C-alpha cells in the first residue's frame, strides 16, 4: 500500500465508505483516479503521488482532517463535481496564494479543491 519513501511523511489516506462501487464511480469520474480491488471490502486508489483506499465501514464524515486536492481550473472541476452529485458547501473564495472551494462526496465527507491559478 502506498509508495515507499521517506520516514514520517503521510503515505496513505483511507476513507470508510458505505458503497465502494459508488465511491469509485464518483472519484473516477471527477478526478480520473485509478483503482485496484483487494477483495470485496477494500479498494486502493491512485493518481500521481496520491495513494489511498476505500474500506467498507462506518462512515465518519465529520471530525477528521480536511483533504485538499489541487486543480488547475477550479470552475471546471467544480462543474464536474456537481454533475457527479457533489454538493458545494463553501463556494470558491480567494486566499493569499490561491483560491479554493469545499464540497461533500456521496458519503458526506467534506473535501476541498484549491488552485494557484
Question: Model-predicted segments: where are they?
Answer:
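Conserved active-site tyrosine of GNAT-family acetyltransferases
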Residues: 23-27, 81, 108
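Short secondary-structure junctions
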Residues: 31-37, 87-92
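Short loop segments at secondary-structure junctions
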Residues: 19, 48-49, 58-59, 71-74, ...
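Conserved short beta-strand elements that form part of the metal-binding/catalytic scaffold
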Residues: 33-65, 111-115
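N-terminal beta-strand motif that seeds the catalytic metal site of vicinal oxygen chelate
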Residues: 1-24, 65-67, 117
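Residues embedded in well-ordered beta-strands within globular domains across many folds
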Residues: 11-14, 93, 112
